[in-house]
Amino acid sequence: MIKSDSASTTGHAQTTSTYVNPHVKFPRRPLVAVRNWRISPWLMPVAYFLGRYIVLPSFFGHIQVTGQENIPRSGPVILAPTHRSRWDSLVLPYAAGRHLTGRDMQFMVTIDECQGLQGWFVLRMGGFPVNTQRPAIATLRHVVKLMQRGEMLVIYPEGDIHRDGQVHLLKPGIARLALNAESKYPGLGIKVIPVSIQYSESYPHWGADVNIRIDQPIQARDYMNGNLKLEAKRLTADLTHKLKQLSQESEVRRNIEPENSSPASPPSPCYISTTSRVQLPIPSD
């Protein structure tokens, strides 16, 4: 139906109407306002302390971190970890968070994870939403701003959680984001860092072990010599190769049973080891 806007010359009220095409789908309002994509200055320190010194040491039996010297202390960084469990987002800050670099991590998460009470918590802990099918311009701009500020961003390149321990097909978004930002602002020096996370159990339970291996950075500037689309595919292929190498090394370590171990014996108190050159304080239980 088509109606027109008209005003009566005798002072009567206006009649305002518009044409509405029933076949046109209007875009929904953003589910999460951009202004809410901020880390809480009070919640983050509390949650980080609880996770690092209480929750993780109490839950896991053995936490091993290798390669912390590969984490830059400054400059834009994109961590590209394997995705094996919901514990990953707690384990990553433990392995490469503020105790190591003095900065917090930003997480790219799905829109569904930003709803309700969980969403309130996620958004204040560095998470921000992305529509994996149709990324909003605001989200892409936010990523570029994070890179300009020299932040540390976490993107799970596999997308979903895979509990079989194998590296699955990587999404191309992480390479495209890195190269687009580096192309738009030459000299940013974006580094993409492969990270392997492996648990001793597919569904980690109390007393399970976790092995985090951090590889050397992939320099985004090394992929700026040709067509960005082709270079993004090359970066994705190189990232896949590195993640597979890390995962295989972690699998070998996981299959080595310690001497005098017994499946029936209860888990020992959390033993934390780091094989990088950076030594971290270990809380006493």
Question: PLM features: residue spans?
Answer:
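Structural motif corresponding to alpha-helix initiation and N-cap regions
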Residues: V65, Q115, I137-L140
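Catalytic core of membrane glycerolipid acyltransferases/transacylases, capturing the structured
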Residues: A33, R73-R134
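A conditional alpha-helix N-cap/helix-loop micro-motif detector
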Residues: G61, Q133-I137
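Non-catalytic C-terminal accessory region of glycerolipid acyltransferases
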Residues: I2-L31, I137-D285
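Alpha-helical membrane-targeting segments
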Residues: R35-H62, Q115-M125, H205, S273, ...
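Helix-to-loop junction immediately C-terminal to a conserved catalytic motif
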Residues: G51-H83
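Residues at the C-termini of beta-strands that transition into short coil/loop
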Residues: E69, I111, N131-Q133, S196, ...
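Conserved beta-strand scaffold positions in the cores of enzyme catalytic domains, especially
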Residues: V65, F107, G127-P129, V192, ...
